[in-house]
């Protein structure tokens, strides 16, 4: 047994001896709003990890936006010391994971660092689509799963039905399912006992070569990149030379520590433990999530298995509200990128909008969160164009290209074949809404129903193949509307399929506005174009001259609407008198408007761009 001094004052009792058999590493799988952050709050209270005076709701959700929206975005680890009924004090590392579909990449990171998972299900909602997907992921990672039914204190809790759904999903017996009220604290002690009894301790050799998994990284203005790690073998302490496996860069460790949940320095981290390393790393891109950290002097031969690079799924143009704030927007995106490895951006130039950035996101919620954070944390107004996906195009000259910006989509004459991404879409819904959901996906969103599965009493899982472009607009809101809020969804990229795509260009006052152009399936081009020109007609303010708004596809105008000119009464001063005088004044006004129309610039308000995000479903609602 290796002993070394711990300089940390754990409120749950310090231990001076390294005991891997007393370590438990777990993550929490739950759908959005099923109470996982509240459960962690109760665990922090019961184990006295956080002083009662400092305790607040959603303690681990560090961002204001997380607390306001009630969602977890950044997975936040915490270590608690728990004295169990067997008299031993256990070190439990909990990683609270995000539950929204856009942030599932964080869940994969968390699982790779754990031996066990708490499957948390809301007794009033039952098992949701996202939970099913994450449970399969946990089974793939070979995690010991502890099923827990939460919110048992609520009057509408359906415990028996929820237990049946969990049994179907996991194949467990009823006495393995724990009943908890995270809000009241009921059953939390029993859950902690189940963790120490059922989750296996980490395997690993403290005397082996250093092998640590990076499962997250965040940027600090003073300390540089703080790398969140789980050690599998070996030991790391200040002064050690370490190397990141993917790029072979070498750093000297300045500080190691644990999360209580605030960062607390310790003498060293050993095999099986979860903590952080500060080593003067300047950029988060050098500490890639899923990468392996090893000793620079005695490196391991191979990296820890299977972490794939995150690829953005949804793209949009982002422009500053005023052109002079371009530099500030660039700095804001760079700062966000430090803590968000999934965010991608590159400079772009639009004749209509000026200089801005083409950004890549994991999904529509991720896009919304980034926009909101820029507006809040950096006090910048930004204009976002309509989101779109990554298309593949085979040109007649044999070249193959990828398109993320609709304005760069080639002319029809150059295209041999176009492909768009399809996803495997799973929707769990009560039986009475099956017809409405199938109609929404198949008739409105070009999806194809593949399989229908039973998901417990009066609930079914519908599996579709659907184009990603149809999912990113307003699909989530439409699905909730047609199912009265009861349906839940999850999607995963499946493949690229050949598709009849067309670019629709919007012209305002006969000038193309590239930021308003979009790519759509030919069958929906007229319908979408009609809606957009009508919407823009309402949103663009009237000018001194008439403004035509046109939608052009395949070289011809497919929709048009006109904004009437503001008309000044030039005859107000003419009291009777010569009719030719009146004609002359009206003619002069007409000439002036003609000139204005030629040189006049039309200002397009931000609402016009935001309107594009909402087009597609609201007329059918």
Curated annotation (Swiss-Prot):
* Key word Hydrolase present: yes
Where in the chain are disulfide-linked cysteines found?
A: none
Q: Which domain of life is it from?
A: Bacteria
Family matches, as Pfam families: EFG_C (PF00679), GTP_EFTU (PF00009), GTP_EFTU_D2 (PF03144), LepA_C (PF06421)
Q: Which GO terms describe its biological process?
A: positive regulation of translation
According to its UniProt record, which reaction does this protein catalyse?
Answer: GTP + H2O = GDP + phosphate + H(+)
UniProt key word Protein biosynthesis: yes
Which family does this protein fall into? Belongs to the TRAFAC class translation factor GTPase superfamily. Classic translation factor GTPase family. LepA subfamily.
The name this protein goes by in its record: Elongation factor 4
Q: Which organism is it from?
A: Thermotoga maritima (strain ATCC 43589 / DSM 3109 / JCM 10099 / NBRC 100826 / MSB8)
Top-down, what is the taxonomic lineage of the species of origin?
Bacteria, Thermotogati, Thermotogota, Thermotogae, Thermotogales
């Amino acid at each position: 047994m290796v002993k070394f001094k711990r300089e940390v004052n754990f409120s749950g009792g310090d231990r001076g001896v390294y005991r891997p058999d007393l370590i438990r590493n777990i993550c929490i799988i739950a759908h959005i709003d099923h109470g996982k952050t509240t459960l962690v709050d109760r665990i922090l209270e019961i184990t006295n990890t956080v002083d009662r005076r400092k305790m607040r709701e959603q303690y681990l959700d560090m961002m204001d936006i997380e607390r306001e929206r009630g969602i977890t975005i950044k997975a936040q680890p915490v270590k608690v010391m728990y004295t169990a009924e067997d008299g031993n004090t256990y070190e439990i590392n909990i990683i609270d994971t995000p539950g929204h579909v856009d942030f599932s990449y964080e869940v994969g990171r968390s699982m790779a660092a754990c031996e066990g998972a708490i499957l948390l299900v809301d007794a009033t909602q039952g098992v949701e689509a996202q939970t099913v997907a994450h449970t399969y992921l946990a089974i793939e990672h070979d995690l010991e799963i502890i099923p827990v039914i939460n919110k048992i204190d609520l009057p509408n809790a359906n415990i028996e039905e929820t237990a049946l759904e969990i049994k179907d999903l996991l194949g467990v017996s009823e006495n393995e399912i724990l009943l908890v009220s995270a809000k009241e604290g009921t059953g939390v002690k029993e859950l902690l006992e189940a963790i120490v009894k059922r989750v296996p301790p980490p395997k690993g050799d403290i005397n082996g070569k250093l092998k640590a998994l990076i499962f997250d990284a965040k940027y600090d203005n003073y300390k540089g990149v703080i790398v969140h790690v789980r050690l599998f073998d070996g030991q790391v302490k200040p002064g050690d030379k370490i190397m990141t496996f993917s790029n072979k860069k070498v750093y000297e460790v300045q500080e190691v520590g644990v999360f209580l949940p605030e960062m607390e320095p310790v003498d060293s981290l050993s095999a099986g433990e979860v903590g952080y390393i500060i080593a003067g790393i300047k950029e988060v891109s050098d500490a890639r999530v899923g990468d392996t950290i090893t000793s620079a002097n005695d490196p391991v031969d191979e990296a820890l298995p299977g972490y794939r690079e995150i690829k953005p799924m949804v793209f949009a143009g982002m422009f500053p509200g005023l052109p002079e704030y371009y530099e500030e927007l660039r700095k804001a995106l760079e700062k966000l990128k430090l803590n968000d490895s999934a965010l991608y951006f590159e400079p772009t130039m639009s004749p209509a909008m000026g200089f801005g950035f083409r950004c890549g996101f994991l999904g529509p919620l991720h896009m919304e969160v980034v926009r909101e954070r820029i507006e809040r944390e950096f006090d910048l107004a930004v204009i976002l164009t309509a989101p779109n996906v990554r298309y593949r195009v085979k040109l007649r000259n044999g070249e193959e290209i990828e398109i993320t910006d609709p304005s760069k989509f080639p002319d029809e004459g150059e295209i041999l074949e176009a492909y768009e991404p399809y996803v495997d879409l799973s929707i769990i819904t009560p039986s009475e809404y099956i017809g409405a959901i199938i109609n929404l996906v198949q008739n409105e969103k070009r999806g194809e129903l593949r399989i229908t599965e039973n998901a417990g009493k009066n609930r079914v899982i519908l599996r579709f193949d659907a184009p990603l472009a149809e999912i990113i607009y307003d699909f989530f809101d439409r699905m909730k509307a047609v199912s009265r809020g009861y349906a839940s969804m999850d999607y995963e990229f499946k493949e690229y399929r050949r598709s009849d795509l067309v670019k629709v260009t919007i012209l305002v006052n006969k000038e193309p506005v590239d930021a308003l152009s979009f790519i759509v399936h030919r069958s929906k081009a007229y319908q979408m174009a009609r809606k957009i020109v009508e919407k823009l007609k309402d949103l663009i303010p009237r000018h001194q001259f008439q403004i035509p708004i046109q939608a052009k596809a395949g070289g011809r105008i497919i929709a048009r609407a006109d904004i009437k000119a503001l008309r000044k009464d030039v005859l107000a001063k003419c009291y009777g008198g010569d009719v030719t005088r009146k004609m002359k004044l009206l003619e002069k006004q007409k000439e002036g408007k003609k000139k204005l129309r030629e040189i006049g610039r039309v200002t397009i308000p931000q609402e016009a761009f935001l309107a594009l995000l909402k087009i597609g479903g609201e007329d059918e609602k």
